[in-house]
Amino acid sequence: KSSTPQVCREAMNNMFKIIVSGDEEKTQEAIKMFKDYFKSLPPDEIAFPRGITDMTKWSDRSAVYKKGTPIHVRGALLHNNRVRSLALEKKYQLIQNGDKIKFIYLMVPNVIQENVISFPGHLPEELELHKYVNHDLQFEKTFLDPIKIILDAIGWAAEPRADLQQFFF
């Protein structure tokens, strides 16, 4: 899907080939290797691409965004708020309706006390959010959840399962 990061789409194609070969262990190893690689990538490459609309509808003067705001719109409003609070409007363009953006999950606590940020193409270092990128959740949502649908259908697990015999022998 176009809403999936390109690096994940490519990895899914490779994963399907491994799954079709019929080897659960090789599939699990490939998932682990991709996860390690995924964690080394910059936010720009692993974030969800989206289009942005209705920003004004969800904007709130007192709380940045209204309850029920879609996650990518919430991230865009938080981006604009952060850029303004750091007086970086001259250096970085604010996100507007119609823009193509990316959004990524963050670990909380962080400097904005939110679990998401959106950005147009590149997440500026000055926003001080790179170290808070939630790689585990991002990996789960962008790659693992879609792959698990197929693995569940054929009775496979994404990671090796411990069974009782391993505890006793």
Descriptions of predicted regions:
Residues 1-169:
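DNA-dependent DNA polymerase catalytic subunits
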